[in-house]
């Protein structure tokens, strides 16, 4: 049984593993416990008086909604807040409470890794279900399309009037266009031919192809790890994946231009599809464009989801399917001024 003098509030706050901040209505910091100082990579003295958003490259918190809740005398909780500090992304659970003295108490706790993994697995399962549904519909569409095209060809041969044949020509062309779309919806149907070689060969082919499309105000940077081991993969399929991601980055930069970085690294002790690998390859495509809109991020790998006008929304869905066939994974982080897609491919168990 504990005896003696109880610790004061400051001692308690200083011993917590969660980050605790006291801020005013402008979110200027008036107190930060050691955990918060470590998270924000600043001393208490440097933090004092600085508005929290100025300390971060990106802060996903809906500050207006939080302030509305606090003004109404209610607490506020956001179970998934993204902070970017010195280029590193942190996903946290945040709670806010107004104190009688007028300060706002912010408590930030790292999202539990198991919970985050469960969310990723659930999201991946939903994406697979959506992809399977679209493929099933595509199969149902493809069969009558063949009959429609065949009937139009027969009709074209039977029509004596060339003017009428123009209509059958339109039917055939549009049927072919729909068939091409359906084939893309169906995606890869069979595993590719795997070879064991350096992934940098694929990366260089992608660089060569994209370099012909680069405007003068876009810089393509290569940052390869020369020690990355060879790995089994289908070069054509991985080229398709990387080419799609790099072209998406190029389109995201828009007329303002910017920089795209193609990076390779070795990842250690990584779990992919329930299997633990001692070594894996990580291929990053990073750009400094405007970022992916937040309302698209949860569904970005779903078929028919696109943030670009005129886009089909199939490229990333097919890319994930191809990476799944390699027992790998593809993920991304994005905020204004930074988007990074990372492809992981297994090397050695």
From Swiss-Prot:
SUPFAM superfamilies in the record: ATPase domain of HSP90 chaperone/DNA topoisomerase II/histidine kinase, Homodimeric domain of signal transducing histidine kinase, PYP-like sensor domain (PAS domain)
Write out the GO MF terms.
ATP binding; hydrolase activity; phosphorelay sensor kinase activity
Q: Which parts of the sequence bind ATP?
A: 329
**Which Pfam family is an annotated match for this chain, by its short name?**
HisKA
Alphabetically sorted, this entry's keywords are: ATP-binding, Cytoplasm, Hydrolase, Kinase, Nitrogen fixation, Nucleotide-binding, Phosphoprotein, Transferase, Two-component regulatory system
Please list the residues that carry the modification Phosphohistidine: 139
Q: What is the protein name for this chain?
A: Sensory histidine kinase/phosphatase NtrB
Q: Which organism is it from?
A: Klebsiella oxytoca
Encoding gene (name): ntrB
């Amino acid at each position: 049984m504990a005896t003696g003098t109880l610790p004061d509030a400051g001692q308690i706050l200083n011993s917590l593993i969660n980050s605790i901040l006291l801020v005013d209505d402008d979110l200027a910091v008036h107190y930060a416990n050691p955990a918060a100082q470590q998270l924000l990579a600043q001393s208490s003295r440097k933090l004092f008086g600085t508005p929290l958003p100025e300390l971060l490259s990106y802060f996903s918190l809906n500050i207006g909604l939080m302030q509305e809740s606090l003004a109404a005398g209610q607490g506020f909780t956001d179970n998934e807040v993204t902070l970017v500090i010195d280029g590193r992304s942190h996903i946290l659970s945040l709670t806010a409470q107004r104190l009688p003295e007028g300060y706002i108490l912010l408590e930030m706790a790292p999202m539990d890794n198991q919970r985050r993994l469960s969310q990723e697995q659930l999201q991946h399962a939903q994406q697979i279900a959506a992809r399977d549904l679209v493929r099933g519909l595509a199969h149902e569409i493809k069969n009558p399309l063949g009959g429609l095209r065949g009937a139009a060809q027969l009709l074209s041969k039977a029509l004596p009037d060339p003017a009428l044949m123009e209509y059958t020509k339109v039917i055939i062309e549009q049927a072919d266009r729909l068939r091409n779309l359906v084939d893309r919806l169906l995606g890869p149907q069979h595993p590719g031919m795997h070879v064991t070689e350096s992934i940098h060969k694929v990366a260089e082919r992608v660089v060569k192809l994209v370099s012909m499309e680069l405007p003068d105000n876009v810089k393509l940077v290569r940052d390869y790890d020369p020690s990355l081991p060879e790995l089994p993969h289908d070069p054509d399929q991985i080229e398709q994946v990387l080419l799609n991601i790099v072209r998406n980055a190029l389109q995201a930069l828009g007329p303002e231009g910017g920089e795209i970085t193609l990076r390779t690294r070795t990842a250690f002790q990584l779990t992919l599809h329930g299997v633990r690998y001692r070594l894996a390859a990580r291929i990053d495509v990073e750009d400094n464009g405007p970022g992916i809109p937040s309302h698209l991020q949860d569904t970005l790998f779903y078929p028919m989801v696109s943030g670009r006008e005129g886009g089909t929304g199939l490229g990333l869905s097919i890319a994930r399917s191809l990476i799944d066939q390699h027992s790998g994974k593809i993920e991304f982080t994005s905020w204004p001024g930074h988007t990074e897609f990372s492809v992981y491919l297994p090397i050695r168990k």
